[in-house]
Amino acid sequence: MERRQRGFTLLEIMVVIVILGVLASLVVPNLMGNKEKADKQKAVSDIVALESQLDMYKLDNSRYPTTEQGLGALVKKPTTPPEPRNYPQDGYIRRLPQDPWGAEYQLVSPGRHGKIDVFSYGPDGMPDTDDDIGNWNVGNGAHNNGGNGNGNP
């Protein structure tokens, strides 16, 4: 017996390619938007967690770390004044997270937007741009009293 093999015609292959192209043009932008949202949400979660640990630091030591001491004060006891009086042996966190774009989170204490400012420079990595994500614009309102950190605007 003779078997006859039949393949796809060029037209059928072209139709499949066009359909895949149309699907890709619809799906890829949605996926990219979700990645941006997920990155921003991770930054917000990290900032809220860092803020919580900074509050613990303040409870133990009656003040937040200074800008110079930075967020590293949560990992290792600062040796620059003012040195914390009641620092836990293992620190407040094991290591500092990086923001979703591979940069370090920032601390300004006292903050420009509240008692402390904890923030990421955002996707562009540049300071003082519209895409910065900070505790003053994440919606929890815990430290964004709109002033200089002492309750006065």
UniProtKB/Swiss-Prot annotation:
Residues 144-153 have a biased composition (Gly residues). Residues 134-143 have a biased composition (Low complexity). It holds the Pfam family T2SSG. The chain crosses the membrane at residues 8-28. It comes from the Bacteria. Residues 68-91, 126-153 are annotated as: Disordered. It is a single-pass membrane protein. Cleaved by the prepilin peptidase. Keywords: Cell inner membrane, Cell membrane, Membrane, Methylation, Protein transport, Transmembrane, Transmembrane helix, Transport. The keyword Transmembrane helix applies. Residues 1-7 form a propeptide. One of its GO terms (cellular component) is type II protein secretion system complex. Its main location: membrane. It is found in: Cell inner membrane. GO terms for biological process: protein secretion by the type II secretion system. The modification N-methylphenylalanine is found at F8. Belongs to the GSP G family. Core component of the type II secretion system required for the energy-dependent secretion of extracellular factors such as proteases and toxins from the periplasm. Pseudopilin (pilin-like) protein that polymerizes to form the pseudopilus. Further polymerization triggers pseudopilus growth. Type II secretion system is composed of four main components: the outer membrane complex, the inner membrane complex, the cytoplasmic secretion ATPase and the periplasm-spanning pseudopilus. Forms homomultimers. PANTHER family: GENERAL SECRETION PATHWAY PROTEIN G, TYPE II SECRETION SYSTEM CORE PROTEIN G. This is Type II secretion system core protein G. It comes from Dickeya chrysanthemi (Pectobacterium chrysanthemi). The lineage of its organism: Bacteria, Pseudomonadati, Pseudomonadota, Gammaproteobacteria, Enterobacterales.
